Amino acid sequence: MSQKTLFFATANVYKFEEFSRLFANHGIELEHYDVAIPEIQNIDMSIILRDKVIKAYEILSRPVLVDHSGLAMSALQELPQGLNKQFWEVLKDQVCELATKLDDRRAEMIVYLGFCDGRRIHSVYHREPGEIAYKLSSQGTFHLDRVFIPAGHTVTLSEMSSSERDKISHRLKVTEKAIEMLRSLPYGIELGLRKG
């Protein structure tokens, strides 16, 4: 592993590509570790993230970064959050219709990034306010991005260009928090984020 390379474990190549662009802006190259990490079922996304990052470290035996994203819908008392995968599998393209029927489109996109160096687990998260679109976007590869419109915008994340999305997305904001977190750790020296 080179001085400024960090492993990122995900089976989702599109997610890796987006985070890779965002970390590259800070001089960190992400190396893709293509693995589908089995997820426990829990509403609490921090518990899911902790479990995922431990499993990723056990498989890779190297410092590793993982993410977990979810949606919190106001009309559903902040659900589905950690149960997002199951929620999406059941509702598929009916998420927008559900928000219309409940007459409350407010939602937050939540994303966690976790880092394990073999000794400790560190994590950061970001909650991005917005709303559920009236109609599922036909564009994009992330199911959440196809239904979520960030506050102050009129289109879903999936309808934005990569450059536009990279300037405002929840992934950008959690990446910035992760850079600060990594900078504060001994591993930050190895990544070139601070001097020893």
Pin down the residues of each PLM region.
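Anionic-ligand binding patches
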Residues: S2-F7, Y14-G196
